[in-house]
Protein backbone atom coordinates (compact mmCIF):
# COMPACT_ATOMS: atom_id res chain seq x y z
CA UNK A 1 0.00 0.00 0.00
CA UNK A 2 1.25 3.44 -0.91
CA UNK A 3 0.66 6.23 1.62
CA UNK A 4 -1.67 9.01 0.49
CA UNK A 5 -2.29 12.55 1.69
CA UNK A 6 -5.01 11.31 4.03
CA UNK A 7 -2.32 9.33 5.91
CA UNK A 8 -0.30 12.46 6.76
CA UNK A 9 -0.68 14.55 9.92
CA UNK A 10 0.67 18.00 10.80
CA UNK A 11 1.83 18.38 14.37
CA UNK A 12 1.05 22.09 14.56
CA UNK A 13 -1.22 22.87 11.61
CA UNK A 14 -3.22 26.03 12.32
CA UNK A 15 -7.01 25.95 12.11
CA UNK A 16 -8.21 27.41 8.84
CA UNK A 17 -11.23 29.66 8.52
CA UNK A 18 -14.09 29.29 6.08
CA UNK A 19 -13.14 30.14 2.51
CA UNK A 20 -14.37 33.38 0.97
CA UNK A 21 -14.52 31.71 -2.45
CA UNK A 22 -13.54 28.67 -4.46
CA UNK A 23 -11.39 28.61 -7.59
CA UNK A 24 -11.29 25.64 -9.94
CA UNK A 25 -8.10 25.51 -11.97
CA UNK A 26 -8.38 22.95 -14.73
CA UNK A 27 -5.12 21.31 -15.77
CA UNK A 28 -5.07 20.73 -19.49
CA UNK A 29 -3.39 20.97 -22.84
CA UNK A 30 -4.39 23.19 -25.74
CA UNK A 31 -3.77 21.02 -28.80
CA UNK A 32 -5.09 23.75 -31.12
CA UNK A 33 -2.06 25.90 -30.26
CA UNK A 34 0.45 23.06 -30.35
CA UNK A 35 2.24 21.87 -27.24
CA UNK A 36 0.71 24.41 -24.81
CA UNK A 37 -0.15 23.36 -21.25
CA UNK A 38 -2.78 25.40 -19.41
CA UNK A 39 -3.84 26.09 -15.84
CA UNK A 40 -7.39 27.36 -15.47
CA UNK A 41 -7.71 27.40 -19.26
CA UNK A 42 -4.91 29.94 -19.63
CA UNK A 43 -1.24 29.66 -20.53
CA UNK A 44 1.53 31.72 -18.95
CA UNK A 45 2.74 34.41 -19.60
CA UNK A 46 -0.58 35.60 -21.07
CA UNK A 47 -2.62 34.18 -18.17
CA UNK A 48 -4.55 36.45 -15.80
CA UNK A 49 -3.07 37.02 -12.35
CA UNK A 50 -5.01 35.42 -9.49
CA UNK A 51 -5.60 38.28 -7.05
CA UNK A 52 -6.07 37.63 -3.32
CA UNK A 53 -6.31 39.85 -0.27
CA UNK A 54 -3.88 39.28 2.58
CA UNK A 55 -5.31 36.75 5.06
CA UNK A 56 -8.03 35.72 2.60
CA UNK A 57 -8.84 32.01 2.73
CA UNK A 58 -9.74 30.36 -0.59
CA UNK A 59 -10.38 26.84 -1.73
CA UNK A 60 -8.49 25.91 -4.88
CA UNK A 61 -9.47 22.78 -6.78
CA UNK A 62 -6.85 21.46 -9.20
CA UNK A 63 -8.87 19.50 -11.77
CA UNK A 64 -6.66 17.31 -13.94
CA UNK A 65 -8.52 17.27 -17.26
CA UNK A 66 -5.51 16.40 -19.36
CA UNK A 67 -6.07 13.73 -21.99
CA UNK A 68 -2.46 12.55 -21.56
CA UNK A 69 -3.14 10.45 -18.42
CA UNK A 70 -0.31 11.88 -16.35
CA UNK A 71 0.10 13.30 -12.86
CA UNK A 72 1.03 16.93 -12.24
CA UNK A 73 2.89 18.09 -9.09
CA UNK A 74 1.34 21.52 -8.51
CA UNK A 75 3.65 23.85 -6.55
CA UNK A 76 3.02 27.22 -4.88
CA UNK A 77 5.85 29.57 -3.97
CA UNK A 78 5.78 31.68 -0.79
CA UNK A 79 2.76 30.17 0.99
CA UNK A 80 1.50 26.80 2.16
CA UNK A 81 -1.88 25.24 1.48
CA UNK A 82 -3.79 22.69 3.51
CA UNK A 83 -4.76 19.24 2.32
CA UNK A 84 -7.54 17.58 4.32
CA UNK A 85 -7.01 14.09 5.65
CA UNK A 86 -9.69 11.42 5.88
CA UNK A 87 -10.12 12.08 9.62
CA UNK A 88 -10.60 15.82 9.16
CA UNK A 89 -7.00 16.64 10.11
CA UNK A 90 -4.89 18.72 7.78
CA UNK A 91 -1.35 18.72 6.50
CA UNK A 92 0.39 21.84 5.18
CA UNK A 93 2.27 21.50 1.90
CA UNK A 94 3.61 23.68 -0.91
CA UNK A 95 3.25 20.93 -3.54
CA UNK A 96 0.43 18.50 -4.21
CA UNK A 97 0.41 15.66 -6.74
CA UNK A 98 -2.73 15.73 -8.88
CA UNK A 99 -3.23 12.33 -10.47
CA UNK A 100 -4.81 11.62 -13.86
CA UNK A 101 -8.53 12.54 -13.99
CA UNK A 102 -8.39 13.61 -10.30
CA UNK A 103 -9.75 16.80 -8.75
CA UNK A 104 -7.61 17.74 -5.73
CA UNK A 105 -8.98 20.40 -3.36
CA UNK A 106 -6.62 22.47 -1.22
CA UNK A 107 -7.29 25.38 1.13
CA UNK A 108 -5.00 28.41 0.99
CA UNK A 109 -4.75 31.02 3.72
CA UNK A 110 -3.00 33.88 1.89
CA UNK A 111 -0.77 35.03 4.74
CA UNK A 112 2.38 36.07 2.88
CA UNK A 113 1.92 39.13 0.62
CA UNK A 114 3.70 39.37 -2.68
CA UNK A 115 3.66 38.02 -6.21
CA UNK A 116 4.08 34.26 -6.21
CA UNK A 117 4.16 31.56 -8.88
CA UNK A 118 1.78 28.61 -8.93
CA UNK A 119 2.94 26.01 -11.45
CA UNK A 120 3.40 22.40 -12.43
CA UNK A 121 6.75 21.09 -11.20
CA UNK A 122 7.22 19.12 -14.43
CA UNK A 123 9.54 21.69 -15.98
CA UNK A 124 8.47 21.07 -19.56
CA UNK A 125 4.82 21.66 -18.57
CA UNK A 126 5.68 24.85 -16.69
CA UNK A 127 7.81 26.16 -19.57
CA UNK A 128 4.93 25.36 -21.97
CA UNK A 129 2.42 27.49 -20.05
CA UNK A 130 1.17 25.56 -16.98
CA UNK A 131 1.86 28.41 -14.58
CA UNK A 132 -0.06 31.30 -13.05
CA UNK A 133 0.94 34.30 -10.99
CA UNK A 134 -0.77 34.66 -7.64
CA UNK A 135 -0.74 38.15 -6.12
CA UNK A 136 -1.47 38.59 -2.42
CA UNK A 137 -2.12 42.26 -1.63
CA UNK A 138 -0.49 43.65 1.52
Features from the language model and the residues they span:
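Extended terminal and domain-junction accessory segments
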Residues: 1-69, 109-115, 122-138
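Extracytoplasmic beta-sandwich strand-turn segments characteristic of Greek-key/jelly-roll folds
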Residues: 17, 46-52, 76-113, 138
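Histidine-centered divalent metal-coordination motifs
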Residues: 72-79, 119-125
Amino acid sequence: RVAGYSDLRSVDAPPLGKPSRSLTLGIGMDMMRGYVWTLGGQAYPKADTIDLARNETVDIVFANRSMMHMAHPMHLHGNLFAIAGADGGIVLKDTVLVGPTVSMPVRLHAANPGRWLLHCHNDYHMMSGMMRELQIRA
